[in-house]
Amino acid sequence: MNDLLSGSFKTSVADGSSPPHSHNIEMSKAKVSGGSCHGGNNLDTFFLDVEVVNEDLKELDRLCHNLRSSNEQSKTLHNANAVKELKKKMDADVTAALKTARRLKGNLEALDRANEVNRSLPESGPGSSSDRQRTSVVNGLRKKLKDEMEKFSRVRETITNEYKETVGRMCFTVTGEYPDEATLERLISTGESETFLQKAIQEQGRGRILDTINEIQERHDAVKDIEKSLNELHQVFLDMAVLVEHQGAQLDDIEGNVKRANSLVRSGADRLVKARFYQKNTRKWTCFAILLLLIIVVLIVVFTVKPWESNGGGGGGAPRQATPVQAQPPPPPAVNRRLLR
């Protein structure tokens, strides 16, 4: 099934078609790199892209559940045509899972590139709260993807082991003998189980179990294809798991984080000192401005009212003309009372 999956994926790549989610993330990264967004808007765009990745993770989990259910259903089928139809369904699920995994890988790499661009912005350098938040979120997504990888790995092991048991039971049904481990591994790895059973039928004349041969062949084809696709899917997951471990080690580097934290604390203290200096200067110049404004207001009031004009001997201005003083008549001469008598 892996061949079918890888073939369909290669076809989609050759056609030049790209997943819409990946395109959206690349477009948002272009906006960030173009500097069209500030810090808050960058985080908004970042978390929108994270939501896209979460949706793909949910889709991957759904496909894994479908594959597990189909494998359980295959245990109840004993008809070649039914097994063939189920094989097609499982092929489609594994193909979709591989496409989703590759899209997830591309989206996570796009988020890493966006984080690199964000580190070049002011206040968002390596070790900053914004950088650590973004890096932790991306690594969390990778760990979720690693969990999905483990689920698919368990499904692959289950399918392989159950197929081995099925081939052993079929050989026992036809030949009357259960093959040893080496023979069973050789039959499964080389695909000679059908030839082996056909020889047994020819020797024993059991033409009535041709349906069993067809069923085994369909199961063999299905398991081989699925195993190939799951191996390819597993390799994609392993590539991302290496990045998770590497970046997780960087996050867990306590000594380095403490040094970066000390550097940020010192930088913050220096900025507080500068802010205090600017605050004092601002207050001083504010007082000067208020004093100057008061002086200007006083001068305006003085020159508007002109209090010196209300005082008689005041300063400047044209001199007033003196009012002429009327001379009073002299008193009448005194009369000698004696003469009158």
Curated annotation (Swiss-Prot):
One cellular component term from this protein's GO annotations in UniProt: plasma membrane
Domain of life: Eukaryota
Residue span(s) of domain t-SNARE coiled-coil homology: 213-275
Transmembrane segments: 285-305
PROSITE patterns: SYNTAXIN, T_SNARE
Membrane topology: Single-pass type IV membrane protein
Keywords linked to the UniProt accession: Acetylation, Coiled coil, Membrane, Protein transport, Transmembrane, Transmembrane helix, Transport
A Pfam family it matches: SNARE
Positions of region (Disordered): 1-22, 111-137, 312-341
Topological domain spans for side Cytoplasmic: 1-284
Main localization of the protein described in the UniProt heading: membrane
Listed GO MF terms: SNAP receptor activity
Gene3D superfamilies: 1.20.5.110, 1.20.58.70
InterPro entries referenced in this protein's UniProt entry, alphabetically: SNARE, Syntaxin, Syntaxin/epimorphin_CS, Syntaxin_N, T_SNARE_dom
Coiled-coil segments on the chain, per record: 64-185
Topology Vesicular: residue spans: 306-341
Bias-annotated ranges (Polar residues): 8-21, 126-137
GO biological process: defense response to fungus; intracellular protein transport; protein targeting to membrane; vesicle-mediated transport
Post-translational modification N-acetylmethionine, affected residues: 1
Family, as annotated: Belongs to the syntaxin family.
Subunit structure: Part of the t-SNARE complex.
PANTHER family, per database record: SYNTAXIN, SYNTAXIN-122
Protein name: Syntaxin-122
Phylogenetic placement of the source organism: Eukaryota, Viridiplantae, Streptophyta, Embryophyta, Tracheophyta
Gene encoding the protein: SYP122
